[in-house]
Amino acid sequence: MEAMTPEEYLMQVKNIDLRICSLEGELHDAENENDTEYVEELRQTIKQDIEKHKELKFRIRNEIQQLPDNRLSTLLIEYYVKGKSWEMVAAALGLKDEKNVRLSLREKALKLFAAHYPKYFLYYSDLHILT
């Protein structure tokens, strides 16, 4: 695995969602142009991406659920896995200040994730986790 930050690692789920949406738009355009060969290529690519997305989402969700802090793991799942906005994440945590969630709690959650999986993020392994 290529060296990534915890944020980049978790963003893989959101990024593949964006790719699938883009390909679906391209598929729609190709269908309108009756380009059957290209339509079939796009369908196969989308199918492969969806399979990859399911596996990645399942793995990352399981890794997050192993974290000892339920509040921080909920934050990571709501934002990175479920793709919710920071406002929705704050509401899921029972908080009103989305800015605090986005800036402060997110940083704590990412540090906790990095500390829990040092094999992925060796240069984060010596970070002090704020409590």
Where in the sequence are the language-model features?
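Major-groove recognition helix of helix-turn-helix-like DNA-binding domains
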Residues: 75, 98-112
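Short N-terminal micro-motifs specific to bacterial/archaeal maturation
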Residues: 80, 92-93
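Alpha-helix boundary/capping and short turn/kink residues
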Residues: 69, 95-98
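Short amphipathic alpha helix immediately N-terminal
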Residues: 67-84
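Hydrophobic positions on the alpha-helical face of helix-turn-helix-like DNA-binding modules
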Residues: 75-76, 89-91
